[in-house]
Amino acid sequence: MAFLKKSLFLVLFLGLVSLSICEEEKRENKDEIEQEDDEQSEEKRALWKDILKNVGKAAGKAVLNTVTDMVNQGEQ
């Protein structure tokens, strides 16, 4: 009977250890996926920042040219 108890405890212990290892791997995979998502969102933010910066420059130049033309026409 004692032999069966020891065997049962050994099986349960090994099962818990393998379950623990699987859970740890799941957490690591989840963390890696979240990190990749964070990196992608940072890249998107940087891209939008560049786009908005270029649009702002173009709009500023257009306004400056329009105002300059209006001033030049007023002087003539």
Swiss-Prot record:
This is Dermaseptin-B4. Potent antimicrobial peptide with potent activity against Gram-positive and Gram-negative bacteria. Probably acts by disturbing membrane functions with its amphipathic structure. Has an activity of stimulation of insulin release, which may protect the species from being eaten by predators by causing fatal hypoglycemia. Has hemolytic activity. It comes from Phyllomedusa bicolor. Belongs to the frog skin active peptide (FSAP) family. Dermaseptin subfamily. Expressed by the skin glands. Keywords: Amidation, Amphibian defense peptide, Antibiotic, Antimicrobial, Cleavage on pair of basic residues, Immunity, Innate immunity, Secreted, Signal. The modification Glutamine amide is found at residue 73. GO terms for cellular component: extracellular region.
